[in-house]
From Swiss-Prot:
The gene is FUM7. InterPro entries: ADH_Fe/GldA, ADH_Fe_C, Alcohol_dehydrogenase_Fe. Pathway: Mycotoxin biosynthesis. The keyword NAD applies. GO terms for cellular component: mitochondrion. Dehydrogenase; part of the gene cluster that mediates the biosynthesis of fumonisins B1 (FB1), B2 (FB2), B3 (FB3), and B4 (FB4), which are carcinogenic mycotoxins. Within the pathway, FUM7 is involved the addition of the tricarballylic moieties to the carbon backbone. GO terms for biological process: fumonisin biosynthetic process. GO terms for molecular function: alcohol dehydrogenase (NAD+) activity; metal ion binding. SUPFAM superfamilies: Dehydroquinate synthase-like. This is Dehydrogenase FUM7. Disruption phenotype: Impairs the production of fumonisins but accumaulates the intermediate tetradehydro-fumonisin B1. It is an enzyme of class 1 (oxidoreductase). Induction: Expression correlates with fuminisins production.
Length: 424
């Protein structure tokens, strides 16, 4: 097969995985990498929409039907645990030696967790709770004896901008009892290869493309806090290292913001789509550097019917305004780096000025809200039927999420409720 124009390199020089593959059709890239991995028992996990598409047929034909041992189609948003276990059982029965995913963050997260559970012979949610208690954010890295590393190779082919394909984190929701979303981190959950094909994403509905784009914006924006740097970032954590991280976050955020607008103007612009996809490779660096209540509150909105990316559209501007109003000088200086990205770019500046904003009287929440509005995305909980009566339960769940607990402005249940009222 011709590999002219194929690009293949590490996503990030600081980690051995994943590698990025792009420049040729995804099905050709997957077949090439499957052969290089000497895989003969390939398992495909596809989103519900892609499971009915020509794209899946193209992938199967390229791989050779004889090498495909199973399929799992349609993991719901926010990744229900029952679907993770359904996938886990299938992986065991088929003895897959390679997994290929087609879809967004829920599919990617489901495979991450199933791979890790498979390596540790987990069969029940109770066993998973015990194992995964060692893999929660902020905890020391567990030994390989405590948590066996995931071992089945995986190729992710993303069709949204969630950025999950580049991270070692995953989340799943208990839909049978408390409806809480649990976040897990383990080094072995990195993908082996991420295949990027902007043409494949043309079939992704605009709502999902732009909302997951804002989710990626959320990763970069909260990553600027630096509140997780001492526990999560690999490096010397010196002041100079932190400055480099901040510059990288600003550069990737700016590239993503501008390219998203190009897609808004021209849906078929595959060059802009590829720029967005490539910008996401720095999401792990941002997420390991900082996180906050937009993620923590957002994790708890899934069971109420809010899509993964749409949680950021609604909550991120409100959390930013709260943190700006209640933060100290150091935090304000960090948040100013976000507004600098907007006011330092001619395209983004025009967007803000056209909406009546000016540098001297805007905060980070204002500029992010204006940008989300320009993309035509939802901006209130009421649009999802979430009202005051549910705020206290959401806030209670959010306060058990580590992302809320480490927000740079200390929060409690009542303060989270205040943020929810801002998003009402």
């Amino acid at each position: 097969m011709s590999l002219d124009h194929h690009q293949f390199h590490q996503a990030n020089s600081r980690n051995s995985k994943p590698y990025i593959s792009y420049g040729i059709p995804f099905w050709r890239a997957c077949a090439h990498h499957a052969k290089a991995l000497n895989s003969h028992r390939i398992y495909i996990v596809a989103s519900r929409s892609l499971s009915r598409s020509q794209a899946l047929e193209d992938l199967k034909n390229a791989l050779g039907l004889i090498h495909i041992v199973g399929e799992y189609n349609g993991i719901a948003q926010h990744t229900p645990w029952e679907q993770v276990f359904g996938l886990l059982r299938d992986l065991r029965q088929t003895q897959a030696d390679l997994i290929i995913t087609l879809g967004g963050g829920s599919v990617t997260d489901g495979v991450k967790l199933a791979r890790l559970l498979a390596a540790n012979n987990v069969t029940t949610l109770e066993q998973a709770d015990s194992l995964l208690s060692h893999c929660e954010p902020g905890k020391p890295k567990p030994s390989d004896e405590t948590v066996q590393p995931a071992s089945i190779p995986v190729i992710n082919v993303p069709t949204t901008l969630s950025g999950a394909e580049f991270t070692r984190a995953a989340g799943a929701t208990n839909t049978q009892s408390d409806h809480k979303k649990r976040i897990i981190i383990h080094q072995s959950m990195y993908a082996d290869i991420v295949v990027l094909d902007p043409e494949l994403s043309l079939g992704t509905p605009a709502r999902f493309w732009f909302s997951t784009g804002i989710r990626a914006v959320d990763h970069f924006v909260e990553g600027i806090y630096g509140n997780m740097a001492t526990t999560m970032v690999q490096g010397d954590n010196s002041g100079s290292d932190q400055l480099i991280i901040e510059k990288d976050i600003q550069a990737s955020l700016g590239a993503l913001l501008v390219a998203l607008l190009h897609t808004k103007d021209d849906w078929q612009n595959c060059d802009a789509r590829l720029r967005q996809m490539l910008a996401l490779k720095d999401c792990p660096r941002a997420g390991h550097n900082g996180v906050g209540a937009s993620h923590g509150i957002g994790h708890q909105l899934g069971p109420f019917g809010v899509g993964h990316g749409e949680t950021s559209c609604i909550i991120l501007p409100c959390v930013l305004k709260y943190n700006w109003s209640h933060g100290d000088a150091r935090l304000r200086a960090k948040l100013q780096l976000i507004t600098d990205v907007f006011w330092g770019n001619a395209v983004l500046t025009k967007l803000l000025v056209d909406r009546g904003l000016h540098p001297q009287d805007t905060d980070p929440g204002d500029v992010i809200a204006a940008y989300i509005s320009a993309l035509g995305m939802p901006n209130s909980l009421a649009k999802y039927g979430i009202h005051e009566a549910q705020f206290h339960q959401i806030a209670e769940n959010a306060m058990e999420d580590v992302c809320t607990q480490v927000n740079p402005v200390e929060l409690d249940k009542n303060k989270v409720v205040e943020i929810l009222y801002m998003a009402a």
